Amino acid sequence: MNVLIAKTKEECKVWTDNIVVVDVLRSATTICQLLQRGKRDVRVFEDVSKAVAFKEKNPQFTVYSELDFPQGFAHEDNSPYAASKADAGTPALVVTTAGTKALFGARQASQIFMGGFCNFYELAALLKGLSRDVLLVPSALFANKDDAEDFLCVSALKDFLQGFGNAELAVNDVKNT
């Protein structure tokens, strides 16, 4: 298995092997927290209008997002902390600036994974078992390319998968961003 790091969102859109979308600070960590809380139904959307339309037909979903919604539209912040307080029985909908857009940008991939430092070792163990190539996608490619955390994490994950590097050192680098 080869492990590559995406440099452009166009690379993601045509990749057909495995993709890992990395969003260190928000969406991946929020989604991981929702799943850890026991949620069995977590859906992602690429834009607010589609999320609003879905929620109107499915009012049982709790929306997690940092984006602007129509006035009066109830939603939680795209926050791992808010997700940690979530009711496990309520389905969730997540729409974000970069992470969920990156997931939709990866539609051609055979398998799509999401993560960051929150599930680094579990993700690495899973990826080591794959035979097909892996493209690591910093979600910042789909929004603010200045988000250094995503790039630090994909570099650390690539190094770790190739048998060198130390995730804890990368976490310390993130603390300095």
Residue ranges with predicted function:
Residues M1-E11:
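Cofactor-binding active-site loop characterized by glycine-rich and histidine/acidic residues
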Residues K9-C12, I19-Q33:
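Short acidic, Gly/Ser-rich segments with clustered Asp/Glu that frequently serve as metal-coordination loops
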Residues V21-V22, Y64-E66, V94-T96, G115, ...:
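Short beta-strand segments
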Residues V22-T29, E46-S49, T97, C118, ...:
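Conserved active-site and cofactor/substrate-binding residues in soluble primary-metabolism enzymes
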Residues L34-K39, K55-F61, A74-P80:
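Glycine-rich loop at the start of a catalytic domain that most often binds anionic cofactors/ligands
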Residues R40-F69:
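A short aromatic-anchored loop/beta-hairpin motif
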Residues N58, H75-Q111, A125, A148-T177:
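Long, charged alpha-helical interface segments
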Residues L126-V134:
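Glycine-rich phosphate/diphosphate-binding loops that line cofactor/substrate pockets in enzymes
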